[in-house]
Amino acid sequence: MTQSNPNEQSVELNRTSLYWGLLLIFVLAVLFSSYFFN
């Protein structure tokens, strides 16, 4: 029964890593767009 907690933590960690990945891609897209427009 106690194994459900680590699983929830791993899922939460995956969500946070996914959000950081999307944020990183968004920042890179903004930098590349500003670079091309300049």
Swiss-Prot record:
The record's Pfam families line, in alphabetical order, gives: PsbL
Instruction: Please state where this protein is localized.
Output: Plastid, Chloroplast thylakoid membrane
Q: What family does this chain come from, according to its entry?
A: Belongs to the PsbL family.
Biological-process GO terms, alphabetical: photosynthesis
Name of the protein this chain belongs to: Photosystem II reaction center protein L
Swiss-Prot/TrEMBL keywords = Chloroplast, Membrane, Photosynthesis, Photosystem II, Plastid, Reaction center, Thylakoid, Transmembrane, Transmembrane helix
InterPro entries (alphabetical): PSII_PsbL (IPR003372), PSII_PsbL_sf (IPR037266)
What are the annotated GO cellular component locations?
chloroplast thylakoid membrane; photosystem II reaction center
Please give, as recorded in its UniProt entry, the membrane topology of this protein: Single-pass membrane protein
Q: Which residues cross the membrane?
A: 17-37
Major location category of this protein: plastid
Task: Tell me, in a sentence or two, what this protein's role is.
Answer: One of the components of the core complex of photosystem II (PSII). PSII is a light-driven water:plastoquinone oxidoreductase that uses light energy to abstract electrons from H(2)O, generating O(2) and a proton gradient subsequently used for ATP formation. It consists of a core antenna complex that captures photons, and an electron transfer chain that converts photonic excitation into a charge separation. This subunit is found at the monomer-monomer interface and is required for correct PSII assembly and/or dimerization.
Report quaternary structure and partners. Answer: PSII is composed of 1 copy each of membrane proteins PsbA, PsbB, PsbC, PsbD, PsbE, PsbF, PsbH, PsbI, PsbJ, PsbK, PsbL, PsbM, PsbT, PsbX, PsbY, PsbZ, Psb30/Ycf12, at least 3 peripheral proteins of the oxygen-evolving complex and a large number of cofactors. It forms dimeric complexes.
Name its species. Ephedra sinica
